Amino acid sequence: MTIIVGIDPGSRVTGYGIIRQQGRHLTYLGSGCIRTVVDDMPTRLKLIYAGVSEIITQFRPDCMAIEQVFMAKNPDSALKLGQARGVAIVAGVNQDLPVFEYAARLVKQTVVGTGAADKKQVQHMVRSLLKLSASPQADAADALAIAITHCHFNQSLLRTSAAKVNPLAGRLR
């Protein structure tokens, strides 16, 4: 059994989602958004760090999955996103969590089936996959999708690792 916290970083809104993976079964544990309503960037970063740290303390995940930075049209936005992402990663690393990174297109491809999916499609599939009664907020749904993606790739890695250490694996045809 593994608990994963997914993080969708943003300088104004950082989404988070927590799921438990038991084999192929996923269970929703919680999700939400850390909203920073102040204007100065250092205070926003402090609030993101504190919020992510609190979530980690509350849910005690085994690992963190976070969205990779993508190239934004506005360089200032990309820098702010990178800073928000950095403090979220530090919050995880400071609590000894391994951190895994996934590209947004890969997350959409894994959860929806197309890397060009829009937010509504991601929300719908997250709701369906986790059997939720309502769609989560967009940023929380993105964070849950990141956690789901990690589960998908973690299962693949576990199968690959088992095949490598299984003495019978070489005999299977």
UniProtKB/Swiss-Prot annotation:
The active site is at residues 8, 67, 139. Its cofactor is Mg(2+). Its main location: cytoplasm. GO terms for molecular function: crossover junction DNA endonuclease activity; DNA binding; magnesium ion binding. It is found in: Cytoplasm. Binds 2 Mg(2+) ion per subunit. GO terms for biological process: DNA recombination; DNA repair. Mg(2+) 2 binds at residue 67. Mg(2+) 1 binds at residues 8, 139. The keyword Magnesium applies. Keywords: Cytoplasm, DNA damage, DNA recombination, DNA repair, DNA-binding, Endonuclease, Hydrolase, Magnesium, Metal-binding, Nuclease. Its EC number is 3.1.21.10. It comes from the Bacteria. GO terms for cellular component: cytoplasm; Holliday junction resolvase complex. It holds the Pfam family RuvC. The RuvA-RuvB-RuvC complex processes Holliday junction (HJ) DNA during genetic recombination and DNA repair. Endonuclease that resolves HJ intermediates. Cleaves cruciform DNA by making single-stranded nicks across the HJ at symmetrical positions within the homologous arms, yielding a 5'-phosphate and a 3'-hydroxyl group; requires a central core of homology in the junction. The consensus cleavage sequence is 5'-(A/T)TT(C/G)-3'. Cleavage occurs on the 3'-side of the TT dinucleotide at the point of strand exchange. Belongs to the RuvC family. This is Crossover junction endodeoxyribonuclease RuvC. The gene is ruvC.
